[in-house]
């Protein structure tokens, strides 16, 4: 039997049968700077309340660029609205109750595998995302 993998929002997949799940979104600000180096690293996270952004990405450091200028991206947390891109699930009692209804519905459909942050309504770091995908694939495909 052919299986479909869904990594999008599980509530959207089921046409919001039990209501909408809440998410957190992001806003990105891209800035070109006429300096050769801004922060010396590709990514620096800012978790102190005094900063309005959560991280700054300096793209040239992913490829060890030697350009005379640089581009940075500041990432800001943002309330989610249906017209925004959902990035992170909101892990609270109300949303977990709603998600569990969708999860039960998903378990009844053997043709679909739900994965990732939005499909499993869980926060994953990248290493956890890869590990979860491998584990889920082995389990669902019996390999």
Language-model segments: which ranges?
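Short, well-ordered coil/turn residues at beta-beta hairpins
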Residues: 1, 7-8
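C-terminal segments that line or cap access tunnels to active or ligand-binding sites in enzymes
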Residues: 2, 12-143
